[in-house]
Regions:
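Extracellular/periplasmic solute-recognition and catalytic clefts
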Residues: 215-226, 243-300, 323
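Ligand/substrate-recognition segments at binding pockets and active sites
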Residues: 37, 219, 359, 363-433
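Structural transition elements
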Residues: 330-368, 386-391
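Aromatic- and charge-enriched surface segment that lines or borders ligand/interaction sites
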Residues: 82-133, 166, 256, 302
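Short, well-ordered beta-strand elements
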Residues: 32-41, 92-94, 165-166, 210-213, ...
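A structural "hinge/loop" feature
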Residues: 41-57, 80-81, 107, 129-130, ...
Length: 433
């Protein structure tokens, strides 16, 4: 299989392996099977239970593997589990692990590694950003454990032997197996955590069960991973190495692609016509299930006042941001993308009104909250460093100044420090997705 250079309008972050392939007989391979991917920024962590963003998930999906994976058609496929049974009307699942599973250090991977991973996810001490994910899956006692009302050992998951994992749900969840492909429900090596504790996720201590292992981490530059010979499907892992580059500017990514230094990168929608002419056949436009939004800090003025929050909500020109600023995006009125199977989006009548009416409503709300031309609304808009995020922030601040007279200060940080500040509540209005 040749490593082919591709440009993507958006990054496809899925639970599907990007490295496995069935190579036809006599197919010539490229001399070096190295894949260089623009991942935009350094991940906040590589601990599966602490992952909260796509930049980390993309790497963790290559370093670790769960019970199942999702193929390109969105279908659940066996991964660490070779098969499973569903019992008690969908309230109990029995997963049978493959024989001979190993961690990257050669130690056996067992059902207990899954139990530990899932217990870590709901343990308040872990502070997993996806702790609620297990409660949403209705795993027995997950919600109570997250709330601090039950012990982690009461979680509805147990190892009946080294190769058998039993999961008990509080109610049937038809899509439960699809949820297992997300890193929060990946296994972690109990023998490594027993030795290193919270320091297990430092690069020098980590042990993996996925197709690749961490080889090098140059902060804010790149992460390099190499093929894991202990991986269950190593014979089909064609790539020998993957490089995840922290290029936080789409133009830089594109220029390095043109220079042959990157194999896959994002490009701004505005550049598509020119790229289709200059690089025919190399551009892929792929839909992505993702919603970008801004999060209010409700514990700080002025956003502890619902009238202020509604005023900003009403005066966001979603069409402008989606079509003109970013391009090829769909204006969002809900957090859940409308393409999600079985989801019916709610129509909010007030967002269907002309902008002039929405502005009048917003101004009235701000006046009630004590803001006017002599006392304008002032706040800080916080986003992680990336050129498209900056364009969005500038557009929003300009719109709010034009419609409401708001004085908006822009603040940006590198991804890791941005996450730390957001977790600490050090923001007023912050970008999320």
């Amino acid at each position: 299989m040749y490593t082919r250079n591709l440009l993507w309008l958006v990054s496809l972050v899925s639970a599907a392996p990007l490295y496995a392939a069935d190579v036809p007989t006599n197919t010539p391979l490229a001399p070096q099977q190295v894949f260089r991917y623009n991942n935009h920024s350094d991940p906040g962590t590589l601990d599966p239970q602490k992952v909260e963003e796509n930049t980390a998930a993309q790497i963790v999906l290559d370093l670790f593997e769960g019970l199942v994976w999702m193929d390109g058609e969105g279908q659940v496929q066996p991964a660490q589990a070779e098969r499973w049974e569903i019992m008690d009307g969908g309230r109990r699942y029995i997963f049978h692990l493959r024989s001979g599973l190993q961690c990257s250090d050669g130690q056996p991977l067992t059902a207990e590694d899954f139990v530990l991973g899932w217990q870590r996810a709901v343990d308040p001490k872990t502070a997993s950003p996806f702790a609620g994910y297990l409660a949403q899956a209705h795993i027995n006692n997950a919600a109570a454990i997250v709330a601090g009302k039950a012990d982690v050992t009461s979680l509805g998951v147990k190892a009946t032997d080294d190769r058998t994992l039993e999961v008990t749900l509080e109610q049937p969840v038809p899509w439960f197996t699809t949820m297992l492909a997300w890193p929060t429900l990946f296994p972690v090596p109990h023998h490594v955590i027993a030795k290193h504790g919270d320091s297990w996720s430092k690069p020098e201590n980590m042990v993996y069960n996925g197709a690749f292992v961490l080889d090098q981490w140059v902060v804010n530059e790149k992460i390099t991973a190499r093929k894991n010979p202990k991986y269950r499907d190593a014979q089909h892992t064609v790539l020998q190495q993957v490089e995840y580059l922290a290029l936080d500017n789409s133009v830089t990514g594109y220029n390095r692609y043109r220079a042959g230094e990157v194999d896959l990168t994002w490009v701004p929608a505005q550049q598509i016509p020119a790229i289709e002419k200059s690089l025919p056949g190399e551009l892929r436009i792929i839909p992505r299930l993702n919603s970008e939004y801004y999060n209010f800090n409700l514990e700080k003025p002025p956003f502890n006042d619902v009238r202020v929050r509604r005023a900003l909500y009403l005066t966001v020109d979603r069409q402008l941001i989606a079509r003109k600023v970013l391009g090829l995006r769909t204006p969002a009125t809900t957090l859940t993308p409308p393409e999600v199977k079985g989801f019916s989006a709610t129509t909010f009548d007030e967002l269907q009104k002309p902008m002039s009416e929405r502005v009048a409503m917003a101004k009235a709300l701000l006046k009630q909250a004590g803001y006017d031309a002599s006392h304008p609304l002032r706040f800080e808009l916080f986003y992680n460093k990336y050129d498209l995020h900056e364009k969005t922030a500038i557009a929003l601040s300009s719109e709010w100044k034009k419609w409401l007279g708001a004085q908006v200060t822009l603040r940006t940080m590198e991804w890791k420090t941005y996450l730390d500040a957001r977790r600490a509540g050090d923001f007023m209005l912050s970008r999320q997705s």
